[in-house]
């Protein structure tokens, strides 16, 4: 049995018009700014330059260690300065439209972000996957996707826009709010707090969109998430998943340095061209070369290769042999993901016996190849089926959302 909380009311045309007007008057958010950007913003707002370094340190602590979302809660900052900050900036959380809790503990949030410029409000989902000893948050980087992977439900939704670094981080901050994962902070009304201990230990960029097609905003968000003076997530607990944007894979290794996951799904170019069409631009030889050259690879820092199991498509023993040959010499883990059907798809999940044979061969060749147990199916939060309908705001009703989320995630 799953639990669902509808946390908003239906939008009307008048409400949408108010959203549009508000977007033109929106104050910039301090969340998602680099220290350099925050310094420039504070100086422009009137903070004396000699105080800026100290003020950034204070703000960073309140935003990312204490998790406050109201300047009034920043108790070691003067009342006058708090008023000035509130006049010029915002640190508000996005609207939580809906929260769903699966019978297996998986949680899914539908977040609404305000419009950018003349655009409409957009909605995206984040999924929290609890496991023994860790909790993983699956984060989106775009609204929609451009990649049109044939087996993926998200690929049937056109790209609406990129998310900003603020919106990427807001998913993490709001999830921590609702899980009671900030110290000495009251949880929001209606939040259902799980057992004690740090709730979010890992994040994976495996939600909606291709993170490397939004490189600069994703980079900024992940560097803030891994900053030791704030959210302080180890880069070994942050995994970025890509379908194979080869030039940005090199940049990811050089400029971000987080764990890498590759949505592989096929070991022959002619098949991968169909399943993952970006392969036509960056074929397997180029992709695997970039993986081999990813900085710092070792048995402790492996690349995760994601492989969805499609019946009679990519699940033969010959495919397993080619997979082992393709990855030879790369420190790697191979996540085998049973396909989750969605309305309109022509693909089927491989038989369980065939998945196990495939896994046994890959394991015998020396590669860890766990078969991912689907999580959150009862709340539409399982592998490869995330799809927001936020680009189709109904005329007088709130947005409907149908979504599933990749459950394979990093260590």
Curated annotation (Swiss-Prot):
S-adenosyl-L-methionine binds at residues 209-210, 241, 263-265, 340. One of its GO terms (biological process) is tRNA methylation. GO terms for cellular component: cytoplasm. CDD domains: Radical_SAM. [4Fe-4S] cluster binds at residues 145, 149, 152. Pfam families: Radical_SAM, RlmN_N. It is found in: Cytoplasm. It is an enzyme of class 2 (transferase). Keywords: 4Fe-4S, Cytoplasm, Disulfide bond, Iron, Iron-sulfur, Metal-binding, Methyltransferase, rRNA processing, S-adenosyl-L-methionine, Transferase, tRNA processing. It catalyses: adenosine(2503) in 23S rRNA + 2 reduced [2Fe-2S]-[ferredoxin] + 2 S-adenosyl-L-methionine = 2-methyladenosine(2503) in 23S rRNA + 5'-deoxyadenosine + L-methionine + 2 oxidized [2Fe-2S]-[ferredoxin] + S-adenosyl-L-homocysteine; adenosine(37) in tRNA + 2 reduced [2Fe-2S]-[ferredoxin] + 2 S-adenosyl-L-methionine = 2-methyladenosine(37) in tRNA + 5'-deoxyadenosine + L-methionine + 2 oxidized [2Fe-2S]-[ferredoxin] + S-adenosyl-L-homocysteine. Belongs to the radical SAM superfamily. RlmN family. NCBIfam families: rRNA_mod_RlmN. This is Dual-specificity RNA methyltransferase RlmN.
